[in-house]
């Protein structure tokens, strides 16, 4: 999944020197009473000195102050209680900054310096997300994702059965195949996939034995997933790989790549909606919707549009065709 950071400009934080006290009669903008002697003037409004107060501490303001979203603050009150602070260094943010999917704000200068979680893209520091962990294969995992990470093969296989059950509800069938699951590191995954997979999370290896007459005697399929993957991420990845398995069983694995991979991503989308509704699933779905890859991103959006118009049954029937044509 690609990092989903948004570059935006900070809201105007205006540092203003207070106007000098004057000896004229005006109406106080705060209390509505007449001002007989001295007053503050700012932005066309007049105040008794004791009524020009800080929104945070309610004490009178003298000297310089900060105006933010129409409210006035002592500089120190704004800095300590109101100003947006960088989630990495803790300093006040001004000017241009970054906001991740989860609402964490960062100075733009940290973009190339901090380590981010390989799954949720949150930045990881000693103070942010409790430092996270690092796997031997180089992957980094924040503590939030680590709380649900799947490291035991028994748990992974149980999840695979749950995902398969969801896909069987819409017409897929996995009873015809000897199917096994393995948890491995990124280094081994890259060797298996020969670096050809998009945003590598899983890989499926297919074996088919035929007799002398060309009839299939046995099918053996091995699904490989990254060790330590967060639960929701694993659910989506299993749905993707199991849809490839179904395509293989129907002899349609080598069809149009955008339709094939887009369909697998749609299966991830559908299963996540059924099994794991929530912010983690929404993050994965949003990343797929924003993916600019012609095969995985555009393919997914085309399949999603097709299913929304024609339904799940028509989509499965189209996948089973020899040379399916997916409308653009």
Tell me what each language-model feature is:
Residues 196-235, 242-249:
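Active-site scaffold of zinc-dependent metalloenzymes
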Residues 83, 112-122, 132-133, 172, ...:
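Pan-zinc metallopeptidase signature
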Residues 250, 254-295:
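Post-HExxH zinc-binding segment in Zn-dependent metallohydrolases
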Residues 43, 80-82, 87-208:
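A metal-dependent hydrolase signature that marks the N-terminal structural subdomain at the beginning
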Residues 1-4:
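Positively charged n-region of N-terminal signal peptides that target proteins for export
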Residues 7-16:
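Bacterial N-terminal signal peptides
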Residues 21-25:
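Boundary at the C-terminal end of the N-terminal hydrophobic targeting segment
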């Amino acid at each position: 999944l690609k990092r989903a950071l948004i570059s935006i400009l900070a809201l105007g934080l205006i540092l203003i020197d207070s106007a000098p006290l004057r000896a004229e009669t005006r109406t106080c903008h705060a209390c509505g009473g007449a001002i007989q002697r001295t007053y503050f003037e700012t932005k066309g409004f007049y105040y008794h000195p004791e009524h020009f107060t800080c929104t945070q501490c309610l004490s009178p303001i003298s000297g310089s102050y900060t105006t933010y979203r129409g409210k006035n603050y002592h500089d120190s009150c704004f800095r300590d209680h109101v100003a947006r602070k960088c989630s990495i260094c803790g300093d006040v943010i001004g000017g241009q900054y970054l906001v991740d999917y989860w609402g964490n704000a960062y100075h733009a200068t940290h973009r190339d310096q901090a380590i981010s979680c390989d799954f949720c893209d949150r930045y990881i520091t000693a103070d942010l997300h409790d430092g996270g962990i690092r796997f031997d294969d180089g992957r980094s995992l924040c503590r939030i994702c680590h709380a649900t990470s799947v490291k035991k093969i028994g748990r992974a296989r149980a999840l695979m059965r749950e995902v398969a059950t969801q896909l069987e509800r819409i017409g897929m069938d996995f009873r015809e195949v000897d199917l096994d699951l393995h948890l491995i590191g990124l280094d081994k995954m890259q060797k298996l996939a020969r670096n050809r997979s998009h945003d590598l999370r899983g890989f499926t290896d297919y074996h088919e034995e035929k007799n002398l007459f060309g009839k299939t005697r046995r099918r053996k399929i091995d699904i490989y997933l990254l060790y330590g993957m967060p639960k929701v991420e694993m659910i989506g990845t299993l749905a993707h790989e199991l849809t490839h398995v179904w395509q293989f069983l129907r002899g349609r694995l080598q069809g149009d790549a955008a339709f094939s991979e887009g369909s697998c991503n749609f299966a991830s989308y559908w299963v996540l909606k059924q099994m794991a509704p929530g912010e983690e699933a929404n993050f994965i779905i949003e990343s797929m919707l924003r993916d600019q890859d012609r095969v995985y991103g555009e393919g997914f959006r085309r399949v999603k549009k097709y299913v929304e118009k024609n339904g799940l049954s028509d989509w499965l029937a189209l996948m089973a065709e020899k040379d399916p044509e997916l409308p653009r």
